[in-house]
Amino acid sequence: MSDDETNDGQRFDRLPATDAERTVEGRATRAEVVDYFTDRFGIPPETFDDYTFWEKGAGKIWIYSGDAPTPIEIEAIGMTCLRTRQEHWKPTTDFVQRVGREASDCVIKLDREQAQRFATGEDQDLEWDGDWGYLIAAHEVAGELEPIGIGLYVHGELRSMVPKGRQRDLES
């Protein structure tokens, strides 16, 4: 196996289009990433037509609007969108806030008080009749449903996954 066929935490590698093109064991494919967002959140696959997906290290997936040579040794390209090398894939807050408006599934609508609590990082007991797992938490603003971030719903509890540095007190 050459250096190009291993994970390198200092280098971005474009995701292979399909499983047949995979050269690094465990690396997600573009098709798997798009299918995940489509199957889990109902985001139309064409949403990703103008984007490329990249992995840096093990399972940190980045989305980039454009093209670049692969592999590429830079600090960042686009934004992180997904963590894949764990039992359950986890979308990032940045991704959800930018692309989450396209989602039709696994979106939990929060009222004002629930949204404020979610933004501060507070976990809360909520009823949800959909799938357990990662959900897009959203709140209506000016007549439009706006994604706040990603939450983990298990056993009747919505756990805020808003990173500590991004948590805000919105009560004032």
Language-model segments: residues:
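Polybasic, low-complexity RNA-engagement segments
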Residues: 2-172
